[in-house]
Amino acid sequence: MFDIGVGELTLIAVVALVVLGPERLPKAARFAGLWVRRARMQWDSVKQELERELEAEELKRSLQDVQASLREAEDQLRNTQQQVEQGARTLHDDVSRDIDIRASATPVATPLELAHADLSASPDVDATAGVTDAAGAAHTAPVIAQAQPIAPAPHQTLVPAPHDTIVPAPHAAHLASAPEPVAVAPVDAGTPAAWTPSAPAKLQEKQP
């Protein structure tokens, strides 16, 4: 701590021995040791305080540097925000100007002009409605005229079916060999009935 070498310590011990003598030298040595220890302790405490202060100053400096960097970043953010707001304002002004120019270029119809336009458009609508009604009537009239003449259905006369007769057992063989009855077709009222050759045979069969 005091940068004292071995030669210097021996010189101090010889001087103390000559001045104090052999009886007082041990007490003086103890007293000197206590003062040296106290001096070292104080020196260590001062050194620690200085180191703490230096560390605190370094921390302060680092904090100041960090604060300065944060301020710079905040200033940059403010500048960018101002630029963005200015750009948005200019864009809004340009859009509003374009809208105003277009609104001034397109004429605005007054209520009187709108009413006049409605009155002028109503006769055209009535005329078109009349034309469509006439066209619809023209299309429906031929359909009705074509549907009216309907030809009457031909009158058909119903001929009664021949009555079944009960034939006795001896004549069963004769009926088995007889021809089957022929179905008579419907005959119109205006045409005379045609003679069929099977009529005499049927009359003979009906006789007992």
From Swiss-Prot:
InterPro entries given in the database record: TatA/B/E, TatB
Coiled coil: none
GO cellular component: TAT protein transport complex
TM ranges: 1-21
Classification via Gene3D superfamilies: 1.20.5.3310
Alphabetic keyword roster: Cell inner membrane, Cell membrane, Membrane, Protein transport, Translocation, Transmembrane, Transmembrane helix, Transport
Role played: Part of the twin-arginine translocation (Tat) system that transports large folded proteins containing a characteristic twin-arginine motif in their signal peptide across membranes. Together with TatC, TatB is part of a receptor directly interacting with Tat signal peptides. TatB may form an oligomeric binding site that transiently accommodates folded Tat precursor proteins before their translocation.
NCBIfam families per record: PRK04654.1, tatB
Assembly and interaction partners: The Tat system comprises two distinct complexes: a TatABC complex, containing multiple copies of TatA, TatB and TatC subunits, and a separate TatA complex, containing only TatA subunits. Substrates initially bind to the TatABC complex, which probably triggers association of the separate TatA complex to form the active translocon.
Protein name per UniProt: Sec-independent protein translocase protein TatB
Source species: Xanthomonas euvesicatoria pv. vesicatoria (strain 85-10) (Xanthomonas campestris pv. vesicatoria)
Gene: tatB
